[in-house]
Design a protein with these regions (language model features):
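N-terminal leader segment of winged-helix/HTH proteins
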Residues: 1-28, 95-96
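Winged helix-turn-helix DNA-binding recognition segment
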Residues: 2-5, 39-48, 59-117
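Acidic, metal-coordinating catalytic segment for phosphate/diphosphate chemistry
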Residues: 32-34
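Pre-recognition alpha-helix immediately N-terminal to the DNA-recognition helix
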Residues: 51-55
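Short, charged/polar, Gly/Pro-enriched secondary-structure boundary elements
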Residues: 117-123
Length: 124
């Protein structure tokens, strides 16, 4: 049985539960860019890096900015400080996330999920 809706105009696609189709929520803005998969970004990221990126995407405001402190991120992700630090540094290095401390000597700050570069990652 095929269900045709505005969101599903391809008759070859079967939506198993049409009453449960995802929609953007007014309560949050989190989303992931499909190019993470299409341009092979996921293939170069570790599970901790993917988890950190996903978390930041989900808690970001419309400008992509999150101000969660690292201890709250670690608690939400159930990882230790070293693992989070390594994951974030890789995301900064790949230019997927930018960081600005709350103040000059603060250890916490603003994380911004950046628009994806036009090309995929440089894979060695």
């Amino acid at each position: 049985m095929t269900f045709k809706t505005k969101q599903n105009s391809d008759p070859r696609v079967i939506v198993p539960k049409p009453n449960r189709m995802r929609q953007l929520s007014r309560q949050g803005f989190g989303w992931l860019d499909a190019r993470l998969h299409k341009h092979a970004w996921l293939s170069i990221l570790t599970p901790d890096q993917i988890a950190a990126y996903t978390f930041l995407c989900l808690v970001a405001n419309p400008q992509g900015v999150s101000w969660y402190r690292k201890d709250r991120i670690r608690a939400a992700m159930c990882i230790d400080e070293h693992a989070l630090r390594q994951a974030l540094y890789k995301l900064y290095d790949l230019d997927l996330v930018a960081y600005k401390p709350f103040s000059r000597h603060a250890s916490d700050g603003f994380h911004q999920v950046l628009s994806l570069p036009t090309d995929g990652p440089a894979i060695p």
